[in-house]
Amino acid sequence: MDRDFPIVVQHVSKTYSNSRVGAVPTLEDINLSVRRGEFVCLLGSSGCGKSTLLNIMAGLDTPDSGQVLRHGLPVTHPGTERTVVFQEFALFPWLNVLSNVMFGLRKTKLPREEKERIAREKLAAVGLAYYEKAQVHELSGGMKQRVAIARALAPHPEILLMDEPFSALDAMTRESLYGDMQTLCSRQGVTVVFVTHNVREAVCLGDRVVLLSPNPGRICREWTIDLPRPRHINQAVVTEHAAVITECLRRESAAQLTPTL
């Protein structure tokens, strides 16, 4: 069981304190098992706790109750087997592209020559083989995110956690990255948990879409996306699946706004 599901969320709840309104429940009794090699999209409106859940999976935050297990062992801190790609590119402007990717290997004991080889391999995989000496300020937004993805993949993680990584990019760049992500994840065999509020993006990328309702965040629906790959954001079947999920999202939002008498 543990080998089939590298990351398992068990009864996770989280509450934050707000100086104006007091305790704010963010997550409530979240249970989720992610199968090895699966691409799971966490979908929901702003404030439903998607990013909080991802941070807990990454070991960057802790739950108030419940736990996250990796192969049966509690996740209590970050690790190179679980890497994160954020919405912000989080690159170091004083390092060139190659050095930024090599930073992802800083905790390994590999010799520098091997780190450089791996970094170049990952840059080639994201289409940036000829930009290793470029400075961060010379890159477009899409290129910066490709560098961030290459850095996250450099240590050969088992689990890749992605927090709305494409939301700040233009539509054409996003569409290109959708195809790249499907290819990269398939080749490397990585398990992906991907946070988004974009329904078509979730259908295009995900093997499974998990919908969180807000206030507090709870898992309210799941869909298995059994469509052949590669998928394209404008495919009719993607649009059709997205329409079904969007309608469910609308109903969930309406239920949240309906006063209880």
Name these PLM-found stretches.
Residues 2-6, 15-29:
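A short, flexible loop at the N-terminus of ABC-type nucleotide-binding domains that lies
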Residues 43-45:
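The feature captures the beta-strand-to-loop junction immediately N-terminal to the Walker
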Residues 58:
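Helix-to-loop junction immediately C-terminal to a conserved catalytic motif
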Residues 66-78:
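Conserved ABC transporter NBD signature motif
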Residues 98-106, 116, 224:
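Short helical segment in ABC ATPase nucleotide-binding domains corresponding to the A-loop/adjacent helical element
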Residues 102, 113-131, 183:
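Conserved ABC ATPase "signature" region
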Residues 134-137, 155:
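Conserved signature/switch motifs of ABC ATPase nucleotide-binding domains
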Residues 160-163:
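Catalytic Walker B motif of ABC-type/P-loop ATPase nucleotide-binding domains
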